[in-house]
Regions:
Chain B
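Charged docking surfaces used in two-component/phosphorelay signaling
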Residues: 15-23
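Short hydrophobic/Thr-rich beta-strand motif most characteristic of the beta2 strand and flanking loop
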Residues: 25-32, 40
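Active-site beta3 strand of CheY-like receiver
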Residues: 45-50
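Active-site residues of response regulator receiver
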Residues: 52, 82
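Receiver (REC) domain active-site loop signature in two-component systems and cognate sites
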Residues: 55
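Short, glycine/charged-rich "phosphate-handling" switch motifs in NTP-dependent
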Residues: 99
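C-terminal output helix
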Residues: 106-115
Length: 708, 119
């Protein structure tokens, strides 16, 4: 099994992101004047892991950059320096830099060197008093000491190795060390000195009483010898002396072996440590450039499949699945048993077996879907930073309250809801919250609150974004809408409820901001937010009260693979209407039906005119006939309502969505297909598409409009 | 077969160490942090332990101390895999009872070479 570097690299990227998240979250939670040492440790560890991993994967820019952060954090950890709100800022920006570099490595994108060097300089400034520690490790230090005696005619090395008695307790073994010496010089001469062995009565088996004299070939580098003793240098008395010239001295060496103490007293060398160290550092530095290029290539080649995303699943979830599959297998074998030798008296057993199968399948389904579920915190976690940055830029005081971050949501839905949420939070701070003095004037706390909340409701997840700002003034909104031509000029304010007016903020090309700022109003409006949400099969609602604040409520399906559907019958065909779009179903009272210009039938329901769409005609299934007493299913999408004329309402059930587009072709008015219990295929209605098509036909055919 | 326990809080490093060692024919088990490693070491006797220094819950130094306190691991080689190169850190490692250290960046050849020094 070969090492798949790309796979590991991908894993590292993922891990690095997690560490960055930890870094950011912890930093955001810090109050510089009162820092918990454990928090600093956590932050340090995150930086440390990034550095270590980056170095391992040859991402030297990241490891070098992170080293500076780590060095500073280390000083903080050791209480030599203390955190300030400025240094927290610098560290946060450092995290951003690393993130950028990561993306750079993943996509071969160039990284803005300016930001990096600014942050590096600021980090250096923070470290000012203690800069030297940062340079020792990364810069390869060429050591000249090793070269010193190379010119002399060296004939051998005399190594005197006297382990301390407790050497074994570090897991080291002198015999292994001798063995290594023999590996670099097979002809080495080894003499063991056992003179320190105590009499048997006082002998302790776990202590080391022996010492050794080893004579090695002079061609061997001193560093190579020192390296072997590197781990035990402070657990032994070690003396390495070069032997020059004649054979005599070598012989005297063996002679001195009888009295090792004398040698020890003369020279207890503590030198090898720094030298050996710098040598190993140099080696690493030499290797890196060629290695970096060699490994960069496969990385680039693998870029194409970077879109293949992975998911990290809690091991408990996997265990659960395995258990369930086990259960399923048992049930299956039980049913096979019954089937092999079936008689009518076994019908009860068969039924209970089938019940069990149903139960297993249901649980399996739930658990499989659960694998794709991630907690909302994945989306929410970015907001503390966003709010922090925005509030300081806008000079507003903002308190961010997050709840329900453990609520789980499908990964795809979660990923696609982030942008709309960011937009809403930005809007809330930029347009919603007032400046502190304005708030004080109107008797509010100068610190505004933005709250994010997520919870489950039925088969859906609800995400709320609330602010306690100025609220939206419906009349002003109306005027603005008129000005921008969002509503047609013949519409009157009185004809619309406040809620309908509020919904105008979702109209394309509508911005409530008076000026386009760099924070919001860059052309991505609330219409995009709504479209994104609706593409996910969800919807968004807004509520607002002047002076009290605004609240946006997003409902989303838990997953995109399964939906709660209402089965309906139209001309003998069964269709599925997504339950989430259904407002209500009513029996038609012909007295409430009016005919508008262009032949459009409108149903008057509680102050509202709802256009009727006859599905029979829409799908070319024949004439639908008289409306009297028939069923009208009121559906809503994008704030527009329409009544669908049906023959029959069947049951409600969860349906597994199969794409029509990838299996057949895109069909307007249909969002997908599903297979019903009897094996027949049923089409799922695309309510949004139906309404849009209906509106378009109407606009083409007449000047009247759907009352939104 | 030589049984090795490798503890590191980084998944990628853990995988890399484990792959390298398995490729070289060792029997490898991994642990996510010191306390996980300690638990595993108590359940099975390992011939060599390789551990990162900075880990959540229980760091490498604490792990070494705890293992050395266990008669089964009195003389077992324990290597620290670390980015810390300072003499001070190494001294701390030694004092805790570590056998030796491997300096990151992790390199498969170095790991195997270093490992050979203890088994």
């Amino acid at each position: 099994m070969a090492l798949d570097m790309n796979q590991l690299r991908k894993m590292f990227f993922e891990e690095c992101r997690e560490n960055l998240e930890v870094l950011e979250t912890e930093l955001l939670g810090i109050q510089p004047e009162n820092v918990d040492p454990e928090t600093i440790n956590t932050i340090f560890r995150a930086a440390h892991s990034i550095k270590g991993g980056a170095a391992t994967f040859n991402l030297l820019d990241i490891s070098e950059f992170t080293h500076a952060m780590e060095a500073y954090l280390d000083e903080v950890r050791n209480e030599k320096l203390s955190l300030t709100s400025h240094s927290v800022d610098v560290l946060l920006r450092g995290g951003d830099c690393i993130k950028e570099m990561l993306v750079g490595h993943e996509n071969d994108a160039p990284v803005d060197p300016e930001l990096r060097s600014t942050v590096t300089n600021e980090l250096k400034k923070l470290l000012e008093s203690d800069t030297d520690s940062s340079s020792t490790e990364s810069a390869p230090v060429e050591d000249s000491a090793t070269v010193v005696d190379q010119n002399a005619p060296r004939v051998g090395w005399h190594v005197n190795f006297l382990p301390h008695q407790d050497l074994f307790f570090s897991g080291n073994d002198p015999l292994r060390i001798i063995g290594e010496l023999l590996e670099i010089d097979a002809s080495a001469e080894v003499v063991c000195d056992s003179s320190k062995l105590p009499p048997l009565a006082g002998f302790e088996a776990e202590l080391c009483y022996l010492s050794w004299q080893v004579n090695l070939d002079g061609m061997i580098e001193e560093d190579a010898i020192k390296e072997i003793f590197e781990w035990v240098e402070d657990q032994c008395d070690l003396h390495i002396t070069p032997q020059y010239g004649d054979l005599e001295s070598a012989q005297t060496d063996t002679a001195t072996a009888a009295e090792p103490e004398a040698v020890v007293e003369k020279t207890v060398s503590t030198e090898p440590q720094p030298m050996a160290e710098s040598a190993s550092v140099t080696k690493v530095a030499e290797k890196t450039p060629e290695k970096a290029t060699a490994e960069d290539k496969p990385q680039r080649a693998a870029k194409a499949d970077s879109s293949v995303s992975s998911i990290r699943v809690d091991i408990d979830k996997v265990d659960n699945l395995i258990n369930l599959v086990g259960e399923l297998v048992i049930t299956q074998s039980m049913l096979t048993e019954i089937g092999n030798d079936f008689s009518n008296d076994k019908i009860g057993k068969l039924k209970s077996g089938l019940d069990q199968l149903l139960q297993n399948t249901k649980e399996l389904q739930e658990n499989v879907l659960n694998i794709r579920m991630l907690p909302m915190s994945f989306a929410f976690s970015r907001f503390p930073r966003l709010v922090r940055d925005l509030s300081s830029r806008l000079e507003k005081q903002v308190n961010l309250v997050i709840s329900g971050e453990h609520t789980e949501l499908d990964k795809t839905v979660l990923e696609r809801i982030v942008d709309p949420l960011v937009h809403l939070v930005r809007n809330g701070i930029d347009h919603g919250l007032e400046l502190p003095d304005v708030r004080t004037e109107s008797g509010k706390d100068p610190m505004g609150t933005i709250s994010l909340n997520a919870y489950h409701q039925g088969g859906a997840i609800v995400i709320e974004v609330k602010d306690d700002g100025a609220g939206i003034d419906c009349d002003r909104l109306w005027n603005k809408a008129m000005e921008k031509g969002v509503v047609s000029s013949d519409m009157r304010r009185e004809e619309m409820t406040d809620k309908q007016v509020l919904n105008l903020i979702f109209a394309p090309g509508f911005s409530t901001a008076n000026e386009v700022s760099d924070i919001s109003g860059r052309g991505v409006g609330m219409d995009v937010v709504r479209r994104n949400i609706e593409e996910l099969g969800g919807h968004i609602e807004v509520e607002s009260a002047v002076g009290v604040g605004s609240s946006f409520t997003i409902s989303l399906p838990l997953t995109l693979a399964i939906l709660d559907g209402q089965l309906v019958k139209v001309a003998g065909e069964v269709y599925v209407i997504p339950l989430i779009t259904i407002v209500e179903s009513i029996q038609i009272d012909t007295q409430c039906v009016k005919l508008a210009s262009g032949g459009i039938e409108l149903y008057r329901l509680r102050e509202e005119n709802i256009p009727i769409l006859r599905l029979h005609e829409e799908f070319g299934l024949g004439e639908s006939g008289s409306l009297d007493g028939r069923l009208l299913c009121l559906v809503e999408a994008a704030g527009n309502r329409i009544g669908l004329l049906l023959d029959e309402l069947l049951g409600q059930q969860q349906v597994v969505i199969k794409s029509l587009e990838s299996n057949y072709t895109k069909v307007s008015g249909i969002s997908g297909a599903t297979i019903l219990g009897d094996g027949s295929v049923s089409l799922i209605l695309d309510i949004q598409g139906l309404i849009t098509a209906f509106k378009r036909r109407q606009a083409d055919g007449s000047s009247g409009g759907i009352a939104a | 077969m030589t049984k090795i326990l490798a503890a590191d809080d980084s998944v990628s490093i853990r995988q890399m160490v484990s792959h390298t060692l398995k490729d070289a024919g060792y029997d490898v088990e991994t642990a996510n942090d010191g306390s996980d490693a300690l638990k595993k070491a108590q359940a099975t006797k390992f011939d060599v332990v390789i551990s990162d220094v900075n880990m959540p819950i229980m760091g490498g130094l604490e792990l070494v101390k705890a293992l050395r306190g266990n008669p089964q691991y009195k003389f077992t080689p324990i290597l620290m895999l670390t980015t810390e190169t300072s003499a001070e850190k190494k001294q701390q490692g030694k004092a805790a009872g570590a056998t030796g250290w491997l300096v990151k960046p992790f390199n498969p050849d170095t790991l195997l070479k270093t490992l050979k020094r203890v088994i």
